[in-house]
């Protein structure tokens, strides 16, 4: 007999001796119960024949669950079950188990379950990548082993706090063959949901782990998480009751004790984006903090808003004074941000702005573009512009006006408010002042002052009317640091605006064709009257300036559609053509003198009927 053969034979004898000392009968021999001898014999067997997988598994059976033993068993996996089958030892007699380090002991009954047990121990040893690769290489044939692979992969994700992956491993609808795996998986899914801030769903899912108390450790985790969910939603008394229950079940459950000792103790919340941003997928500390993630996201959105605001402002026709004022405020804001970054003092300034001029001259558009710029400069949190007016805020009683104003302003915090026709806030005709207007103004004043770092108020209206309204409350006048004037569009600007609005939908309005509108545009511009407050009101103001021009273009398109509704149109619709000649396209793009003249007539007629 060669030396290797002798060593293998000695290893088998040691294996038999170890099994007998473990209380397992072999070949009819009477077993004993001597764990120390069993462990020594199994160790001897693996030393003599490292390729005997069952000897390594026997060491697990004897209580040596070190990672080295599992590594040895996996290295010898080709001989899995050979020795026990040779000796006639059944699976019921020889059933090594390994703790997953969290909830369960995993029985090793197959090559795939050995891989799972080894992966669980690797994960406990923080050798996450090795565990993941081992699980990825496992292709279980038996449904029970397939469940075990899913479970251990869930354990790996749970240990590394990859919460979306935990939820993917333990979907609620899955029917588990092993109820213990289901309970432990539910506990991990509960923690995942709570850590992602889905508290109500986490609280509900926890019941799967708690009911029946199949896995006490899983039930403890689920109860603890329920308690923390209650704390996060402000139900502290109920939270403490659950935490005490956990502590009474397991006094060694440290998180419950910490949560009871410290009412400010909370779960660490995260989100899928932060988890995916990790530089090491297995290390939660390699991810940017939630604050850093939010800052990066905000910076990206800020750049977008700034670019959009600049583009919208630059695309507006005319309004050079308004553009200059906005650019000045933007420059001042940027300088103040730089001063703050350098540690220099920065005066607290408001950006509340009066936009004075007739309707339809771009006041709302400027307010929206400016708000986006302020978002881009991180002065405001959101590009929201809440449009309101006296009519929208009034209620049946004076208290309604105050309440409606407060609710509107609360919703606008972080963004802006656009008060249309702000000069109507305070109306004449009341013997002791306008109580409704005063209620709105007083509430507005509080927010303009106390929230000037997170709210911008735009007041729009005619100049002289606004001046008289502001005389009622000098405090309101002082809150507006910027005044921008808007003017009626001149005839040539109205022509340019007509062409610009046509281009928005790839319509063609030539300079020559558009001249049909010039006499009327000039007439509307030259018509003048004065309001009761002394504001100059031109005919084009009464029509609506840009709003009127848009209506002219829309009515002109309607006339073109009627003009084109002929046999040629029917032929185009009936054909299978997908490409058309320039001549064909021109018919559907150009607005003729007749179209524009009819559009003007229809727009004026519509205005007169309103």
UniProtKB/Swiss-Prot annotation:
Principal location listed in the UniProt entry: cytoplasm
Knockout-associated phenotype: Deletion mutant does not secrete EsxN and shows a minor reduction of PPE41 secretion.
Keywords, sorted A to Z: Acetylation, ATP-binding, Cytoplasm, Nucleotide-binding
Function of the molecule: Part of the ESX-5 specialized secretion system, which is responsible for the secretion of EsxN and a number of PE_PGRS and PPE proteins, including PPE41. EccA5 exhibits ATPase activity and may provide energy for the export of ESX-5 substrates.
Pfam families: AAA, T7SS_EccA1_N
Binding site for ATP: 357-364
GO cellular component, one term: plasma membrane
Subcellular location field: Cytoplasm
InterPro entries on file: AAA+_ATPase, ATPase_AAA_core, CbxX/CfxQ, CbxX/CfxQ_RuBisCO_ESX, P-loop_NTPase, T7SS_EccA, T7SS_EccA1-like_N, TPR-like_helical_dom_sf
This protein's encoding gene: eccA5
Protein's name in the database: ESX-5 secretion system protein EccA5
């Amino acid at each position: 007999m060669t030396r290797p053969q002798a060593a293998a034979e000695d290893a088998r004898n040691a294996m038999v001796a170890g099994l007998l000392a473990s209380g397992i009968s072999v070949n009819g021999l009477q077993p004993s119960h001597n764990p120390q001898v069993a462990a020594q014999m199994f160790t001897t067997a693996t030393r003599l024949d490292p390729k005997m997988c069952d000897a390594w598994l026997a060491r697990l059976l004897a209580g040596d669950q070190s990672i080295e033993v599992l590594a040895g068993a996996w290295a010898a996996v080709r001989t899995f079950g050979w020795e026990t089958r040779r000796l006639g030892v059944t699976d019921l007699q020889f059933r090594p188990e390994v703790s997953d380090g969290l909830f369960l002991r995993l029985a090793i009954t197959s090559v795939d379950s050995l891989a799972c047990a080894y992966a669980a121990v690797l994960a406990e040893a923080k050798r996450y990548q090795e565990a993941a690769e081992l699980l990825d290489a496992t292709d279980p044939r038996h449904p029970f082993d397939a469940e075990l692979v899913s479970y251990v992969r869930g354990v790996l994700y749970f240990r590394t706090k990859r919460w979306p992956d935990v939820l993917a491993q333990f979907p609620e609808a899955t029917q588990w063959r092993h109820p213990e795996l289901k309970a432990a998986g539910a506990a991990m899914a509960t923690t995942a949901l709570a850590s992602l801030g889905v508290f109500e769903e986490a609280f509900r899912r926890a019941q799967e782990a708690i009911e029946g108390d199949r896995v006490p450790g899983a039930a403890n985790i689920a109860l603890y998480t329920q308690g923390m969910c209650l704390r996060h939603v402000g139900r502290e008394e109920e939270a403490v009751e659950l935490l005490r229950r956990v502590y009474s079940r397991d006094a060694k459950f440290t998180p419950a004790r910490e949560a009871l000792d410290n009412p400010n103790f909370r779960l660490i919340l995260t989100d899928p984006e932060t988890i995916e941003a990790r530089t090491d997928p297995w290390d939660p500390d390699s991810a940017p903090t939630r604050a850093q993630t939010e800052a990066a996201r905000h910076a990206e959105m800020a750049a977008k808003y700034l670019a959009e605001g600049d583009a919208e402002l630059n695309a507006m026709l005319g309004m050079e004074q308004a553009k200059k004022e906005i650019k000045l405020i933007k420059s001042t804001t940027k300088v103040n941000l730089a001063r703050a970054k350098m540690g220099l003092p920065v005066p607290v300034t408001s950006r509340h702005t009066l936009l004075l001029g007739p309707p339809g001259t771009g006041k709302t558009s400027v307010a929206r573009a400016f708000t986006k710029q302020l978002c881009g400069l991180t002065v405001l949190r959101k590009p929201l512009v809440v449009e309101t007016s006296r009519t929208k805020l009034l209620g049946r009683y004076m208290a309604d006006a105050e309440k409606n104003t407060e609710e509107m302003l609360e919703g606008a915090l972080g963004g802006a408010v656009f008060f249309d026709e702000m000069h109507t806030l305070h109306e004449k005709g009341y013997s002791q002042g306008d109580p409704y207007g005063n209620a709105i103004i007083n509430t507005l004043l509080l927010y303009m002052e106390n929230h000037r770092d997170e709210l911008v108020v735009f007041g729009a209206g005619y100049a002289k009317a606004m001046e008289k309204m502001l005389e009622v409350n000098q405090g309101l006048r002082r809150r507006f640091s910027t005044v921008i004037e808007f003017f009626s569009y001149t005839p040539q600007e109205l022509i340019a605006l007509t062409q610009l609005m046509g281009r928005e939908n790839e319509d063609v309005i030539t300079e020559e064709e558009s001249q049909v509108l010039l006499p009327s545009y000039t007439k509307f511009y030259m018509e003048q009257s004065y309001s009761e407050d002394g504001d100059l009101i031109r005919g084009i103001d009464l029509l609506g300036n840009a709003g009127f021009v848009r209506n002219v273009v829309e009515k002109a398109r309607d006339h073109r559609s009627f003009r084109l509704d002929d046999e040629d149109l029917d032929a185009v619709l009936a054909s299978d053509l997908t490409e058309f000649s320039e001549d064909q396209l021109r018919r559907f793009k150009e607005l003729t003198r007749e179209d524009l003249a009819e559009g003007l007539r229809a727009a004026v007629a519509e205005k007169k009927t309103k």
